[in-house]
Amino acid sequence: QSTWGETEEEHQRTRKIAAMRLTFVVALLLVMLTACQAATFYYDFVVAESSYTRLCNTKNMLVVNGQFPGPTITVHKGETFFVNVHNQGSYGITIHWHGVKQPRNPWSDGPENITQCPIQPGTNFTYQVILSNEEGTLWWHAHNDWTRASVHGAIVILPPNNTYHRLTRPTSYQTIILGSWFNADPRTIALQNHAAGTDPDANDANLINGQPGDKYDCSSDSIYTMTVQFGKRYLLRVINAGVNDEQWFGVANHSLTVIGQDGAYVKPFSTNYVMITPGQTMDLLITANQTPGYYYMATSVFSDFNLAPFNNISATAILLYNGTVSRPTSIPFPSLPNATDDAAAASFTSLIKSLDSYGHPFDIPQTVNQEMVITISTNFLNCTSPACINPFAFAASTNNVSFLAQPISILQAYYNNVSGVYTEDFPSNPPESFDYTGDVSALTPYTAQGTRVKTLNYNDRVQIVFQGTNILSAGNHPMHIHGFSFYLVGKGAGNYNSATDPQNFNLANPPLINTFGVPKNGWIALRFVANNPGVWFIHCHIDKHALWGMQTVLIVKNGNTALTSIRAPPTGMPQCSA
């Protein structure tokens, strides 16, 4: 019916105009929605030396944009960002986006001589970082030698439209980066010890947000301080960027609620401490509900290796209630497990389960068609160079293969069908079966080098069991897989039993993670679907073990369509020497 005063012809004209306006508004909203969904961001990273002083020691070290730790990248779930890395240092460098799966985009994954060759001094390269279902805290770091000791920073991935899960909404968040300080240049330490075949000394200090804290000399005036308001809830985004050490972390007199790990939600649980390995991230809620004052947050090293040196002086920071004026003579300190407490580590990790909620569904392979058992060991190699201190060199291996990097990237060789760079014969099982966690004194600790990779077909349902061994020096090894998050379906002490242990696998709510510690003289089992074509690195995130050869490579072949195949390489890829 027409509006009062309108003719029928005028009424029809008004309806047409209204319909056109509505169509325009809907189209505009769709464009805006598409733009929001496809949001893209650009960053510039300038890698250059800056002068820093810690422990009364001043040195020049590589950092990004003059910051240590480096800048935080803040984005939303599903977005893409580009980072143009300008290398103003004196040697080649690469950057890895730890925990970002990079669907079909191994070109921007970053590990040196695996997916790219280094960005040479005076040049630049732009990484395209493609997010998918990651949400929470991840991080970026250099991925060559030990350069990541000073070249690292956080990636904060906010939920779409900042719609936090009702259990996890904080007042605000704070990034807490655990790190390592070396008085000497860490890259030089790594290369000199590697050439000499020796085990490097421990770091000179542990760090929280770039500061050792007041348990170290010359450090009390620069301790990191986080100010809170009574009654408010805060999200601590904790990252272990340490080079070689797993860490305990806690806050005095405050309970921590774990809500996320490695860019995925977990079923919330409360604890007085966390155990976090190099490479891992954890999202922790803390409520400021104690008597206003000063409270230590602190780390200490978890190191159950028989022979490895470590620095067990705690890094400290201060949790300070707003309005507190004077610093007391005594500040509460968190109670943390001792350095070799395997039981405490196992107790903590057993509490981590996935949170099944809207927008975060499970996709756990209930059956598998590719099974691998990979032993991880520390070993020896013959050392014959003039730099050798002993006739043997420290080494490490997976399935008794100590990985040998090549001067050309494996991705470049694979994509361009270059022969002679690697072989596709990495063993799916240990070449020799033995009592892996028992008395191995009759076995040789020596291993052999090789560039041997494992190939998978697109959409293979994969199960990998990492089996620790007692060869040379048993210990907890944090294994990281690039290109995937995996479900940790099982773990245990001793030798994995393929007949009985799968009966106890958690196929209901296992944690979805990208890095996890294989327990000392124990094993872990993980599952994932190989639906990300490319070349993907697997390695221990204790950097000296990775440098020694505790690493290998997965090649996931293309699917049958363009959308299930590796993307074309970007322009400007750093050139390799072969």
For every predicted segment, state its role.
Residues 41-167, 245-274, 295-311, 385-520, ...:
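Histidine- and aromatic-enriched segments that form or immediately flank copper-ligand environments
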